[in-house]
């Protein structure tokens, strides 16, 4: 064998080895890239496959805010979304019991929310109670927040055989009580609380020597003084918005204060944005990002027709959800402010979520209290097209709250 032949064979062997190693390297590189893509693109799928809860898991991300209302195959006046609680629930304020006060139709109870592209996990009261054992679930906001709180109380109590065990820690009655209410589930050592704070920030007297037209001020840079009670909560659901309008602020002599100075030129939505910045600072400074699951619920739509709440607006003729999307109101401007602030917080507190219920609620013009007020209410009192009959629409909000907690592996063992 001459030198040329030896060189050719060596070259061939060398090239073959290179190609072999190159093929193996390319195969391993491809496998690595594929694995990385799967991890990055489908983290929720990975979580669903590798973790489990005592009841169920959500295996993929879902936008529960988009979908449609569908009529259930079978229902009754005491069954909402299969939860089986009715107006007899002792945790309902009398003002939310529409049938008790004369509403005859029950069709508004016959609907369930169906998200696009996925299913809403069935609410499991026993599971949520067990996950929340030795904990606190806290609602903070206006009376629409109370609407949601009472809904959750009734939903959770269905898993308790002896409901008389559940009690208010200070002995306060639910009906007609304003302010702070804390209901204890003794077997789970769990409290489910409502704290009234329509603005979330402080509202009080104006600074000394303020003009006479300034009766009160909303201090947009000072968080609610009762907020120290909320520290350490496991789940917090905030809401605000219905008091952020001119009717309930500047037209009543309530102006906005910042840095201990009243700013009479500050607009309502500018003030709302500043108050959310104050809320953001409190959450990031006072809450443990490893423990507290924080939600800010979006704006709950109103459905006054032929007027506003104080000009004869009505909704008592509505008995079914809206079916024409073209008739829906545009998204509330409040939501844009809320969403933006939450996005700013994610890098420091990953357990902060936007509980978006506006679009699905916009369809439900049929679910309001309307004229079915408590006995003794004056006939001249405007219809209530803001609050909701219970059982009713807020039950769906709590189903979505539960689904989002599942997707976040809330207190998974």
Curated annotation (Swiss-Prot):
Main location group: membrane
Superkingdom of origin: Eukaryota
Membrane topology recorded in Swiss-Prot or TrEMBL: Single-pass type II membrane protein
InterPro entries, per database record: TBL (IPR029962), TBL_C (IPR026057), TBL_N (IPR025846)
Keyword presence, Transcription regulation: no
GO molecular function: O-acetyltransferase activity
Subcellular localization(s) per the UniProt record: Membrane
Functional summary from the UniProt entry: May act as a bridging protein that binds pectin and other cell wall polysaccharides. Probably involved in maintaining esterification of pectins. May be involved in the specific O-acetylation of cell wall polymers.
Note: Contains 2 motifs that are conserved in esterases, but it is unlikely that this protein belongs to the catalytically active pectin esterases.
Name of the protein described by the UniProt record: Protein trichome birefringence-like 9
């Amino acid at each position: 064998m001459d030198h040329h032949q030896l060189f050719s064979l060596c070259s061939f062997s060398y090239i073959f080895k290179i190609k072999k190693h190159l093929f193996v390297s390319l195969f391993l590189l491809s496998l690595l890239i594929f694995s990385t893509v799967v991890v990055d693109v489908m983290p929720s799928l990975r979580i669903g496959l590798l973790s489990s809860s005592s009841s169920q898991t959500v295996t993929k991300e879902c936008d529960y805010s988009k979908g449609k209302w569908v009529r259930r195959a079978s229902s009754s006046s005491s069954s909402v979304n299969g939860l089986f609680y009715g107006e007899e629930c002792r945790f309902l304020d009398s003002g939310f019991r529409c049938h008790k006060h004369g509403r005859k139709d029950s069709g508004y109870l016959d609907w369930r929310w169906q998200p696009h592209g996925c299913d809403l996990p069935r609410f499991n009261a026993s599971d949520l109670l067990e996950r929340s054992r030795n904990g606190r679930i806290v609602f903070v906001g206006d009376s629409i927040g109370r609407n949601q709180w009472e809904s959750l109380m009734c939903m959770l109590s269905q898993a308790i055989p002896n409901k008389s065990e559940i009690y208010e820690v200070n002995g306060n009655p639910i009906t007609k009580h304003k302010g702070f209410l804390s209901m204890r589930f003794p077997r789970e050592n769990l409290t489910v609380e409502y704290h009234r704070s329509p603005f979330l920030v402080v509202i009080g007297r104006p600074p000394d020597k303020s003009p006479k037209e300034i009766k009160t001020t909303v201090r947009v840079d000072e968080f609610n003084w009762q907020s120290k009670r909320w520290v350490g909560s496991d789940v917090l659901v905030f809401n605000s918005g219905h008091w952020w309008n001119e009717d309930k602020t500047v037209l009543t002599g309530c102006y906005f204060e910042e840095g201990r100075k009243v700013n009479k030129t500050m607009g309502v939505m500018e003030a709302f944005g500043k108050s959310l910045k104050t809320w953001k600072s409190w959450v990031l400074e006072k809450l443990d990002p490893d423990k507290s699951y924080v939600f800010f619920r979006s704006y709950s739509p109103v459905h006054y027709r032929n007027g506003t709440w104080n000009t004869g607006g009505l909704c008592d003729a509505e008995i079914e959800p809206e079916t024409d999307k073209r008739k829906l109101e545009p998204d509330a401007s409040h939501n844009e402010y809320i969403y933006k602030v939450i996005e700013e917080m994610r890098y420091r507190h990953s357990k902060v979520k936007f509980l978006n219920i506006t679009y699905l609620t916009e369809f439900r013009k049929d679910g309001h209290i309307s004229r079915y007020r408590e006995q003794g209410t004056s006939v001249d009192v405007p219809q209530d097209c803001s609050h909701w009959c219970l059982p009713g629409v807020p039950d769906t909000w709590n189903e979505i709250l539960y689904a989002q907690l599942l997707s976040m592996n809330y207190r998974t063992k």
